[in-house]
Amino acid sequence: NIGEELIPGADLALKTLRNMDKQVRVLTNAASYDKSGAEKKFLDLGLYFSTEEIITSRDAALEHVTTGLWGVITTEADDLSDLKTEYIRLTDTQQDFNKVDGFLFLSTNGWNPKKQLLLRDSISKNERPVIIANADLVAPRENGFTLEPGFYGHDLMDLGASKVKFFGKPYSAVYKLLTKSLSEIPGDKIAMFGDSLHTDILGAAAQGWKTVLVTKDGLFSGFDTKSFCEGSGIFPNWRLGRINP
């Protein structure tokens, strides 16, 4: 999907894979909603995945939330029912930023430069853990790109913050969750389809998986991917224009 729109043919590709008795998993950096929310999002797009087939960066991040009072950055619609610790929602009150024991960054919906300045100021005066539950810097949407939590996490690191931890592709924790769900399948028999070199392809290759770069939908739409591969040194096993050409 691109934002809230289904990539043409994605439903047919999924049906084909299931008819071939292939195991299918969705590995997503979307952390704005819990597992049931992710399941509903795909269902609204016409794609059915069971809860066990969806692995999210949020899953990996929440496993690393410790006890204490956490300041959470997320959407108003997120009920945080899967967060099993004490928390407050961060808005634009400096004292709330200052009193928490750590920060959990789930979504940039409603986030803005003013709030980022509050976070930067609080961290600079009293450094605490920052969990970035979506490592993406940007995400392709229907009308361009949005800034994602990973962008703001790196902004903190540029200021010298040393307790920022990223979850989701390309970081290993989320891949380990997926591997656990496919424990009977060796890594070299898993193929990762994705549209980005620095998350999908890099992270999967590090796990010993095969990789397929989708070139005509998503991040590289309209660009020649070969030059980016050569510039980054990241090469997929295969390139595919679309997942259902």
Please tell me what each predicted stretch does.
Residues A30:
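Conserved phosphate/oxyanion-binding catalytic-loop motifs
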